[in-house]
Design a protein with these regions (language model features):
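Short, hydrophobic secondary-structure boundary micro-motifs
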Residues: 27, 102-104
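Helix-turn-helix
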Residues: 10, 18-55
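Amphipathic alpha-helical packing segments from all-alpha helical-bundle domains
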Residues: 113-131
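Alpha-helical DNA-contacting segments of helix-turn-helix folds
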Residues: 52-63, 68, 104
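N-terminal positioning helix adjacent to the helix-turn-helix/winged-helix DNA-binding module
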Residues: 3-14
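Amphipathic, well-ordered alpha-helical segments in soluble domains
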Residues: 60-64, 93-100, 125-129
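Hydrophobic alpha-helical connector segments
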Residues: 55, 70-100, 110, 120-121
Length: 131
């Protein structure tokens, strides 16, 4: 049996495929149908369809943090190097899903509530870099 994180990732990956093929066909129902799940099962992992899409941006921060932990000399990086690593890591990750980011970033992140997970994560990471 898959653990919660694996199920959540599977839901996200399926949603990403559906959204990338045709954003107008993207819905919790479509994701659930594709995975042979009940909609309620999808909602136990994500409160809304936009939350599924925002998960991509959360995963980007998780990958960034993982990379910083793996860099043994990261604590010795200058401010410029740390900020550069933050920016370039995200550019690289965004480039991997360029079409998705181009379609979703404006609505899901930029125009979203200023307290969304992406913006909070960005603020946390910049604060860590500055301190």
């Amino acid at each position: 049996m898959k653990d919660k994180k694996d199920i959540k990732l599977n839901i996200f990956e399926t949603a990403l495929e559906i959204y990338s093929e045709n954003p107008t066909k993207f819905s919790v129902r479509a994701v659930a149908k594709e995975l042979n799940l009940k909609r309620e099962e999808v909602y136990t992992h994500f409160p809304s369809k936009n939350a599924i899409l925002r998960y991509f941006y959360q995963l980007c921060f998780e990958e960034y943090i993982k990379q910083t932990v793996e860099i043994s000399e990261y604590s010795n990086y200058s401010l410029e190097e740390k900020l550069g690593h933050l920016v370039y890591t995200h550019i690289e990750l965004f480039q991997n899903e360029k079409e998705f980011v181009e379609r979703s970033f404006n609505e899901i992140i930029y125009k979203a509530n200023p307290n969304n997970v992406f913006q909070k994560s960005l603020e946390e990471q910049v604060e860590k870099i500055l301190n």
